Amino acid sequence: IIVDKKTVKVSEDGYFVFGLDRDRKFDVTITKTLNGKKEIFTKKVLKRKYRIQRIDGLPENKVTPPESVYKRIREENNKIGEARAINSNLPFFKDQFIMPVEGIISGVYGSQRILNGKPKWPHYGIDIAAKKGTMIKSSASGIVTMAEDDLYYTGGTIIMDHGHGISTIYSHLQSVMVSVGDKINQGDIIGTVGSTGRSTGPCLLYTSDAADEV
């Protein structure tokens, strides 16, 4: 399978998955080659309007971090990137994912945040507001690829690999209850809701990510 010009991993039973860039402006071309026969499919990508969200009153060092923490942020971003880039053969990406916690959706995917009047990168997950200490479930079975207590932006953070480049990220946790390499079943408790990192209140920032993005 080739999506646009990118080869995408296919499972033994014929499943594949890829993600679309938030701001993609053109259709997707999928090329399937089987036993020497090539088929080409075109899928339409619809334009979407995103919410603009303004948040004021944040500590200035969380909006524009001081130069003294640039190295830390860069190192943490590299570790996150490595965990998100894992493209294993785990089969759990095909499962029906569940919500990791019950609560109010206070931030939506794709929204543009303006923090203290300064436009920032778009939001690539959803914020689920819940009481501090609320138990968080794994939304699907998988293997823990990152478990950190105190990242600069996302605080307590867990990343889980579900196979074929699909990962889930759980951020702003009060407590992290798993370790790298742990094999987790869907619904297992992995941590608790907190307000760590750059957060305006107790919530879970929940992100589903695809390593194969076009």
Features from the language model and the residues they span:
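Cationic-aromatic interfacial patches
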Residues: 1-42
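Terminal peptide-recognition signature
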Residues: 30, 105, 142, 187, ...
